[in-house]
């Protein structure tokens, strides 16, 4: 049968049929009867439209080989044979220009003379049976149906056959020929029997047994049976007065719908209190890197070897001392912990063979910093369920904190460009389909805009730290393992670079559940003097550990080098998400893509190139107290990426709640801006839900202050 199809039909038709089958995951080599049926249907659609034109006087005419210069327009638009997206685009544009009702299913043709869509059917069964199936499926008075059979019969809506006798005879003759050719090869019987009816989904399938009982049990109040609930739903007119509808739904609801006007919304109330503090798992804008270019030392790529090599590039070490103590901690222990790291690194170098990993000695200072033996003893529930006054610990309410300016500075820094590239352009094979070509073009443009972005550095740093910590937590559960904080990048000249930010020492890590906590101490290099914004560093003990020579415009200057030390903790599930931070790139790329798609649909062509290469155009980036901030497309890419990265770095229940609840208010405000006259009820309750998430988290507080700027400017 496959050979017959390839001989019998025009190659273009065969190719279209193969494409259509592939789109539905069907194989022309296996489902050969279906292959033949699709080709036949395509050919009938093309023959239906062939030679039919509309002339200057809008009269329908038939031209088989006439004056090529005549001003003729095709009478039929062919929809069948296009890919789904394109086909719907054509249907939509016809509906928009002619005002014809949009069909529910894709039709085959559009007739510009009669102004109607046509559904063509070709059947191996009785024409009237097939006609009824088609009509039952499309359920539209507006779409005209025309059925042909291989026996020369036809049937059409209201016996209106659209075409002249001769054109239809051509189609019937061709179908008869196909049938004879098949029969002579012994293919007809199998082909005739393989036709399945139109698949229509029954509107009402009966529910019986357990499902029926469950349905009756789960009805809303005031409904006695599924039938009367169905009748109510079917008769429910969605437009009209909302209050009435609500009271119709339930006797308990009495919502007053208040119009939402420009004067309605008030700004969100941000909490008072001391300024909020840094709570990320590693330093961001304040981090300092010791690095080696073009690493080629022995054991290159083994973190401990790389770290020792980076440490050796710095010569300004000095006796460490505490410059900003941690309010609640035993600060000398932090100092001793750093001295221990230096001493143990020195010991490694004195050994003949450097080990691949380093477990720290379990000294008093590390046991204290890692909370060893601090956790209350776990008791099996069976042993204590009879205790009469068993209860959970009383926990204090979190203390409110106010928004501090450092978090906006952190965000601004994350949007900036660095002088290194943090991700490679993915080596992906040749594009096969045009859509892949557009996708990889977008990916390449986007990568070029964000590869040097500081937020991308944070992604790679986060992925590295979380991967290393999770590995060590599983591989060395009882050990206090020393984990270097490393990242890799390329310089402008394309040279490889390995960076060391500092070290982590992990505590005991018997992590059975996703939420079991592993404690760690982080020690990170920085040039930031903590005394400038002490509130930011509330959770840290900061040491001064050396002096660094920096090249500036006026020559070399010496700056003190600090070490930011703190106790921290994470869990398996947090590390798992940290390892997947690269998803932030994907999320922001998708946001940019939807902007490109919007442009492209207006211009009706792919706008990717223009979008990225038109440097003069500016785009809205965000709201600030000054109004809407605008910037280049690159700036938009980097801002969206930074938002996504900060959502990951500062993930918290407060952020989840704020995002979900503030979105509702945002949509209402946008509806007002679009003059949709929104109405609300219990707006106070919505404000309460949003504001209960504004406690002390720096990223949530910053988002809330941005939200207030948006409210101010959006509703001016």
UniProtKB/Swiss-Prot annotation:
Cofactor: how and how many bound: Binds 2 manganese ions per subunit.
GO cellular component, one term: host cell nucleus
Catalytic EC class: hydrolase
One annotated GO molecular function: endonuclease activity
Compartmental location: Host cytoplasm; Host nucleus
Motif Nuclear localization signal 2 (NLS2) boundaries: 184-247
Residue sites binding Mn(2+) 1 per the record: 41, 108, 119-120
InterPro entries membership: INFV_PA, PA/PA-X, PA/PA-X_sf
EC numbers on record: 3.1.-.-
Protein family per UniProt: Belongs to the influenza viruses PA family.
Assembly and binders: Influenza RNA polymerase is composed of three subunits: PB1, PB2 and PA. Interacts (via C-terminus) with PB1 (via N-terminus).
Record-linked HAMAP family: INFV_PA
UniProt name for this protein: Polymerase acidic protein
Protein source organism: Influenza A virus (strain A/Duck/Hong Kong/2986.1/2000 H5N1 genotype C)
């Amino acid at each position: 049968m496959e050979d017959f199809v390839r001989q019998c039909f025009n190659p273009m038709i065969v190719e279209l049929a193969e494409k259509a089958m592939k789109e539905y995951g069907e194989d022309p080599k296996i489902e050969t009867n279906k292959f033949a049926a699709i080709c036949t249907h395509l050919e009938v659609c093309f023959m239906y439209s062939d030679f039919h034109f509309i002339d200057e006087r809008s009269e329908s005419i038939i031209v088989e080989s006439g004056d090529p210069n005549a001003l003729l327009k095709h009478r039929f638009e062919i929809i069948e044979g296009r890919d789904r997206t394109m086909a719907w685009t054509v249907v939509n544009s016809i509906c928009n220009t002619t005002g014809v009702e949009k069909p529910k299913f894709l039709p085959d043709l559009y007739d510009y003379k009669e102004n109607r869509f046509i559904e063509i059917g070709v059947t191996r069964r009785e024409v009237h049976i097939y006609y009824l199936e088609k009509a039952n499926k499309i359920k539209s008075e507006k779409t005209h149906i025309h059925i042909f059979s291989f026996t020369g019969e036809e049937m059409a809506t209201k016996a209106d056959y659209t075409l002249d006798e001769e054109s239809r005879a051509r189609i019937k003759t061709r179908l008869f020929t196909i049938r004879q050719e098949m029969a002579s090869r012994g293919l007809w019987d199998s082909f005739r029997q393989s036709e399945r009816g139109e698949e229509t989904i029954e509107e009402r399938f009966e529910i019986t047994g357990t499902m029926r009982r469950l349905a009756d049990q789960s009805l809303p109040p005031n409904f006695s049976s599924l039938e009367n609930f169905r009748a109510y739903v079917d008769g429910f007119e969605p437009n009209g007065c909302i209050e009435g509808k609500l009271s119709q739904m339930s006797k308990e609801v009495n919502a007053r719908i208040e119009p939402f006007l420009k004067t309605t919304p008030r700004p969100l109330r941000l909490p008072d209190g001391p300024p909020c503090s840094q709570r990320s798992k590693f330093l961001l804008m304040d981090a300092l890197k010791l690095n080696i270019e073009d690493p080629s030392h022995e054991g290159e790529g083994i973190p401990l070897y790389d770290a020792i090599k980076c440490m050796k590039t710095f010569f300004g070490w000095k006796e460490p001392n505490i410059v900003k103590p941690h309010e609640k901690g035993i600060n000398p222990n932090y100092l001793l912990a750093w001295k221990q790291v230096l001493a143990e690194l020195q010991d490694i170098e004195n050994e003949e063979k450097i080990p691949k990993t380093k477990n720290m000695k379990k000294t008093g200072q590390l046991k204290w910093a890692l909370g060893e033996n601090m956790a209350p003893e776990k008791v099996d529930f069976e042993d204590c369920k009879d205790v009469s006054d068993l209860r959970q610990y009383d926990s204090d309410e979190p203390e409110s904190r106010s928004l501090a300016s450092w978090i906006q500075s952190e965000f601004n820094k994350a949007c900036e460009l660095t002088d290194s590239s943090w991700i490679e352009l993915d080596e992906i094979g040749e594009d096969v389909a045009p859509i892949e070509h557009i996708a990889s073009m977008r990916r390449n443009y986007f990568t070029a805009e964000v590869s040097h972005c500081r937020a991308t550095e944070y992604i790679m740093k986060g992925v590295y730290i979380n991967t290393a910590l999770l590995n060590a937590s599983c591989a060395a559960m009882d050990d206090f393992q020393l984990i270097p904080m490393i990242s890799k990048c390329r310089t402008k000249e394309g040279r490889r670079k390995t960076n060391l930010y500092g070290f982590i020492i992990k505590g005991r890590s018997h992590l059975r559940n996703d939420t079991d906590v592993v404690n760690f101490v982080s020690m990170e290099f920085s040039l930031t003097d903590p005394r400038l914004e002490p509130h930011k560093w509330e959770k840290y003990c900061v040491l001064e550990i050396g002096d660094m020579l920096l090249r500036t415009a006026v020559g070399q200057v010496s700056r003190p080098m600090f070490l930011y030390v703190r106790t921290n903790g994470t869990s398996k599930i947090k590390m798992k998400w940290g390892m997947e931070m690269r998803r932030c790139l994907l999320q922001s790329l998708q946001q940019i893509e939807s902007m490109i798609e919007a442009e492209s649909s207006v211009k009706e062509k792919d706008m990717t190139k223009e979008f990225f290469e038109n440097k003069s155009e500016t785009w809205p980036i965000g709201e600030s107290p000054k109004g809407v901030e605008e910037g280049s497309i690159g700036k938009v890419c980097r801002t969206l990426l930074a938002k996504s990265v900060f959502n990951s770095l500062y993930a918290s229940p407060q952020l989840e709640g704020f995002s979900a609840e503030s979105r509702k208010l945002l949509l209402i405000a946008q509806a007002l801006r679009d003059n949709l006259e929104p109405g609300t009820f219990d707006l106070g309750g919505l404000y309460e839900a949003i504001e209960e998430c504004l406690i002390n988290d720096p990223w949530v507080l910053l988002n809330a202050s941005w939200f207030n700027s948006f409210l101010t400017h959006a509703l001016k």
